[in-house]
């Protein structure tokens, strides 16, 4: 994955073009972040379709490095509340480690995101918030 590839991926993610986003993933990816584990493309679609009903999420890439096996990104993930995403809604959807977001609230988080690659496709994703 090149920087240009990742720029296209981030642009598709920011535009919520899930079909284009999913084209970057292997058939059965494994994502693990903040207590969520996703192992199929359908789970990936379901998770982001749910979350993005409540928030507008965008990724700003600050640093990028890659090899044939790994892409590493440091960036700012911006979350803007479109509707109230309450503790009750989060808990009911297995998202206990996520924070509530009120309509109009903006959260910006620096994240390190690591993508493991096989044949140019994302097979695993992990991320960490950096204080």
List the predicted regions and their residue ranges.
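C-terminal and inter-domain tail/linker signature
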Residues: 1-131
